[in-house]
Amino acid sequence: MPYKTRILTLLIIAGAAAAFTLYVLGGREASAKYDIPKALPPEEYGNIVIDRLSTKNGEKPVSFSHWIHRKKHTCRVCHTELEFNMKTNTTEITEAANRQGKFCGACHNGKEHDGVQMFGHTDKTQCSKCHNGNRSAGKDKFKELANLPKNKYGNGVDWSRAVEQGLIKPQHRHTDKPLEADIDKTLKLEAEWFSIPPAIFPHKSHTAWLDCSNCHPDIFNIKKRTTKHFVMSRLLAGEFCGVCHLAVAFPMDDCKRCHPAVVK
């Protein structure tokens, strides 16, 4: 091989190696740039405190644990059928509505549900089960998740694998029959930095929990092609994926779940 050809070949190889190094190590650079929310204890991740009206009416705020409920129901049951908004404290939940069988009262009505006796909204001795203002309420039940597939982040559970392996079988409806969303399309979303590998979005693992309407058109407007504005800073501000992946679904410090080619 001529000398100039060898030199050119070596330069091409070196350049490719440098580009690849930047590409796979980009996660470290990104982690340093973005202010990822501080991790909560596993037993608190996914727990929220609802206080739209409670304090105003002399009651303690309501604590709600997503991980306690998602073992039994998929997200669409509450966020489609029961009409809970995705954003905390924006749903007009009232005690009167609960007693009429709406919102929490759809299940918590003092009757048996899936073989379990549910507490209702007329027994005043039960109020503190929800109205306790304590984000860590119910943590004594966290040990019930011990046998589920592990994940390093969030509450330490890989919920998608738990469903795939049949370890949990959450109900996908309360009374309505959901439309079957047999969508197995995986999207490849280019990152805003050259050094960050693309994000991979699998529809199938999301439709196992959600309806299409949970994301479209409010969170992701397909017609407006909002993924063009799909940058990490907006996700961390609670937009797009950040609606769920900041407080309930696996958190954003789990870089490899979305950017599988990254090395963190």
Residue ranges of model-derived segments:
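Inter-heme linker and motif-flanking segments adjacent to c-type heme-binding CXXCH motifs
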Residues: K56-W67, H73-L148, E180-D184, K188-K264
